[in-house]
Amino acid sequence: MAKQLSVSALRVLHAVAGGTHYGFDVIDLTALPGGTVYPALSRLERDGFLSSSWESVTVARAEGRPPRRYYGVTEQGLRTLNDALRTLHALRPIRTARLSPVKSRS
């Protein structure tokens, strides 16, 4: 059975699926707070949906900042994201359907 992801985790996964990003990029892309994004990145990586790598210390030093950890989506993450998006799109008509009033039987 596929792992159920929270809406926040799906937003993070979707943001990273657009290319390799570091944590603050994901915060900007999702408009989620860091206290949500960084734990989600950690869980998504632990569960095999993301992979990460550290940038070169040389590059970071040249720019006068600490090294960034870059995240990319895995094949498993892409499959999970696409499955979740298909499910959400299938549910959209149900969520947005107008319900007509029901008349009393009495």
Language-model-detected regions and their locations in the chain:
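Beta-hairpin "wing" of winged helix-turn-helix
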Residues: D47-G64
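Amphipathic alpha-helical dimerization/coiled-coil segments
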Residues: A2, E75-S106
